[in-house]
Amino acid sequence: DFAKRLGVSTSGSVDKVAIQLCDFVEADFNRKLDEPSKIVEALAPKERKELWRKLDIFPGGIHGEIMFATSSCLTNVDGYYQSLALKAMRLGVAMAYQSQIVNEYCQDVLYGIPRPHKMRVDLGVLDPDYVNVLPNGHEPFLGFTMVQLARQPEWQRKATDAGAKGLRIIANIETGQEMIQRWEMDGTFYGFTGNWIMQEAVLASGCVDLFACDMNCSMPIDP
């Protein structure tokens, strides 16, 4: 349905449609600055699009928008507050639709739609008798893959052979929030520690065997 909404052909296998969707999104990201984004055109409300065009803040490709907006902040490039405000709003539209909304939809397709369910939370999910792996950052793809691997008997055996009771994947900060929205807890995907503020306490617990950082929001400290 998401591919169809963007005007991507849904004929063929699931893998073929997925590749076509990725190609479409990538092409839109790299669209020229003065070439309107097809993603924004497809997803934004009609009345908003009309206003954005009137204000000249309907964005092109997000990569060009980022370069245009950030370079405008350089000395003697654009010091007029109204112009900078409009560029910030234009970049905001691009980020909301081409980055955040598309990213969430794609994660929903891959891992399921978020639904309410029970989840173990806080530092009590960390048990020193287990090998505790914490994916940390903003992109849950690594974390989901770790859960899939940890559920396989061979990876559990590696932990027990080393003297632990087993291997657990513990969700953490933004990556963890994406994970716990979509997948229910079990003996392997055990729970959620908390948000960014708890990161030092999590590491100070001495229960973390692997702090798997996918990108930002990972403190540059040595446990």
Regions found by a protein language model. Name each.
Residues 1-223:
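Metallocofactor- and cofactor-centric catalytic cores in central/energy metabolism, strongly enriched
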